[in-house]
Every structure is written in structure tokens, then in C-alpha cells.
């Protein structure tokens, strides 16, 4: 049992060492399991031979035991018939067979012990091989994953300089430019419409105010006065006031009206 324990440790150590040093862990692990399978086949053959020898020894033991019993019965028969010499000869044969059977009994006990040990060792080796296969599969999967990851990293590392990636980057920048241009055009179009409506609203307000001013002036009200304010009766024209004073008043009013129009136009 101790020998196979050491063998198992050596196998595991060699397996780990091969995995760490080999260029292709998958092939090395596969070969290691194949070698262990060959050892298992040899051990099974040894167990089979030991069991076969055990069976033959057991058969010989049974045969000699039966023969010894037969010669004992003959010795009894000879004594019953007064054949003492013949009985003595039969007992001598019985003793020889009994001694041989005792030797076979000892040999059989040893063979059974050896066979049992070999069976246990065989089961232990089978378990170790099963463990090695599981570990092999796990390590092979890890090796494949590491290889795939290395290839992926290499591919990703080369994407920065590849023409395909550069084309994607150019197209992305072009799409971004097109989106920005479209957004700017939309904003400008909206600004133009808003500006036109603002001008129309401002012009409408100015026209309304000018019309109101004209109406108030036609009614005799000055700008800024309330329509509800009572109008003073016009004083009688004094014939003594010179005519040029009326002309001057008209000129002042016209000037004020022109100034007001200019201010309205500047709004």
C-alpha cells in the first residue's frame, strides 16, 4: 500500500511538472494518462495471475485433503480385516498427503493476503487514474481558455492599427459630423421662424400703437392722456393775436409729430 501511495505522489508531481514545463500541456497530459493506463493494465495482469495461483493452490489443498481422508478410511478397512501392514501403509500415505495439504494451506493463506493487497492497490491506482483524468480535463480546459484569451488579447491589440478599425473610426466621425450639421441646421431653421414671427409681432404692435395715436390726435387728445379726460372748450379766437403765432404753433406740433414718428420707427 505504501509503495502505491509513493507512486501516486510521484505521478502527481511529474504530472504537475510536465504541465508547467511542456509547450503543449494537452498532449503531455494525454500521454501521462496513457502511461498510467498501461501501468494499470500490468497491475491487473499481476492481480489476475495471483488469483489464478491462489485458485490452483486451493484446488490442490482440497484434492490432498480428500485423498488423505480416503487413505484414512482404507486404513480403517485394513484394520477391520486384520491387515495391519496394509493399514500401516495406508496411514503412511495419509500422513504424506496431510503434510502436503498443510503446506498448501500455508501457501494459500499467503496467496490470499497477497491477492487482497493487490486488489486494494489496484483499486487505489484506478482511483488515482480517475483523479488524474479529472485533473487532466480541468488543466486542458484551463490551457484552452488561456490560449483563447491570449489569441483574443492579441487580436484586440492589433485592432488599433488595423485598416478595418480605422474605417470604423472614420465612419463614426463622419456620422457624428452629419448629426451635428443636421442639429445645427434644425436650430437655425427654428431660429429663423422665431425671428420672423417676432418681427411680425413687433410690426403689428407698432402699427396698432400708431393707429391709436392717430385716432387720439384726431379726437384732440395728446399722447398719454386718457380718453375719459374732459376736453376744455376752445377759447374764442382773439383777433388781436397775430396770425404768425398760429403758424408757429402748427410748426411746433408738426415737429413734435415727426419726432414721435421717428421714435416709433426706431422701436
Curated annotation (Swiss-Prot):
Its main location: membrane. Pfam families: PspA_IM30. It is a peripheral membrane protein. Residues 26-156 form a coiled coil. GO terms for cellular component: plasma membrane. Keywords: Cell inner membrane, Cell membrane, Coiled coil, Membrane. Belongs to the PspA/Vipp/IM30 family. Required for thylakoid formation. This is Membrane-associated protein Vipp1. It comes from Synechocystis sp. (strain ATCC 27184 / PCC 6803 / Kazusa). The lineage of its organism: Bacteria, Bacillati, Cyanobacteriota, Cyanophyceae, Synechococcales. The gene is vipp1.
Amino acid at each position: 500500500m505504501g509503495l502505491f501511495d509513493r507512486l501516486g505522489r510521484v505521478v502527481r508531481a511529474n504530472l504537475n511538472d510536465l504541465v508547467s514545463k511542456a509547450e503543449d500541456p494537452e498532449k503531455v497530459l494525454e500521454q501521462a494518462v496513457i502511461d498510467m493506463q498501461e501501468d494499470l493494465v500490468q497491475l491487473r495482469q499481476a492481480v489476475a495471475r495471483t488469483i489464478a495461483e491462489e485458485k490452483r493452490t486451493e484446488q490442490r489443498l482440497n484434492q490432498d485433503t480428500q485423498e488423505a481422508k480416503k487413505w484414512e478410511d482404507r486404513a480403517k478397512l485394513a484394520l477391520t480385516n486384520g491387515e495391519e501392514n496394509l493399514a500401516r501403509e495406508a496411514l503412511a500415505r495419509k500422513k504424506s498427503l496431510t503434510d502436503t495439504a498443510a503446506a498448501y494451506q500455508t501457501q494459500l493463506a499467503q496467496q490470499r493476503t497477497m491477492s487482497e493487497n493487490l486488489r486494494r492497490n489496484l483499486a487505489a491506482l484506478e482511483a488515482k487514474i480517475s483523479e488524474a483524468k479529472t485533473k487532466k480535463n480541468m488543466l486542458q480546459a484551463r490551457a484552452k481558455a488561456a490560449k483563447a484569451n491570449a489569441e483574443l488579447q492579441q487580436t484586440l491589440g492589433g485592432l488599433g492599427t488595423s485598416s478595418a478599425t480605422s474605417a470604423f473610426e472614420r465612419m463614426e466621425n463622419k456620422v457624428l459630423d452629419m448629426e451635428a450639421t443636421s442639429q445645427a441646421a434644425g436650430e437655425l431653421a427654428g431660429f429663423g421662424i422665431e425671428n420672423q414671427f417676432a418681427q411680425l409681432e413687433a410690426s403689428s404692435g407698432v402699427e396698432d400703437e400708431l393707429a391709436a395715436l392717430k385716432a387720439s390726435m384726431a379726437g384732440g387728445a395728446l399722447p398719454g392722456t386718457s380718453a375719459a379726460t374732459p376736453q376744455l372748450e376752445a377759447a374764442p379766437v382773439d383777433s388781436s393775436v397775430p396770425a404768425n403765432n398760429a403758424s408757429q404753433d402748427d410748426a411746433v406740433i408738426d415737429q413734435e409729430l415727426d419726432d414721435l414718428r421717428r421714435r416709433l420707427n426706431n422701436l
